[in-house]
Amino acid sequence: FVSEIKSIHDNIVETALGNSKSFLNCVEYAIQNFDESERVYFVENDYLHLSDVENYLNDGFSVGASFVTLYDHPDKYNISQYPTLQSKIFVGEHSHWRSVPSTCMTFATHVASLIKNKDILYESCCHEVPSDWYMFEKMQSRGELLVSCMPGRCTHLERDYLTPLVD
């Protein structure tokens, strides 16, 4: 599989670091190799995307978001899990966007936001699996905005976490 991917893009780095350490490795790579204005997209290995990802990510940033996810997590529709959830709805060129308190580790942001929130990213990744909910809650307390498109443009590939309304 890696050789097939390398035939498309030659800058593939294999690691055996685990979930949190792999994410932090990518954060460090982005900070060291990209300009602060550049966007990076972190994608977990168990997500499937619809087409036109780049246009949708650009659309999410156009509504003022610091962090954009194309995953419409079904937990946001579970009143027992989020009994007081209040969201702002934004209209982009391609989608509706909703402010959400958290998402999984598949999201886009600017390198500048990684630098600004580096302490939170590291604090959230001190265990094997990142504390994504904590991470986004903490960053939003600093004024960062996380939006999710509705309907989603990607989905988690676990049956209980499929994006609603997308076949």
Across the structure, where does each feature detected by a protein language model lie?
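Hydrophobic/aromatic beta-strand patches that form the interior of the parallel beta-sheet core
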Residues: 41, 68, 147-149
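Conserved catalytic core of nucleotide-sugar-dependent glycosyltransferases
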Residues: 34, 48-121
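A short alpha-helical cap/connector motif
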Residues: 9-11, 97, 107, 126-128, ...
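A short acidic (Asp/Glu
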Residues: 1-4, 25-26, 51-55, 79-82, ...
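Short coil/turn segments at beta-strand junctions that form active-site/ligand-binding loops
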Residues: 36-39, 64, 143-145
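Active-site-proximal specificity loops/subdomain of glycosyltransferases
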Residues: 1-38
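Short beta-strand-to-loop acidic/aromatic patch adjacent to the donor-nucleotide binding site
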Residues: 37-48
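C-terminal catalytic/acceptor-binding lobe
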Residues: 111-112, 116-167
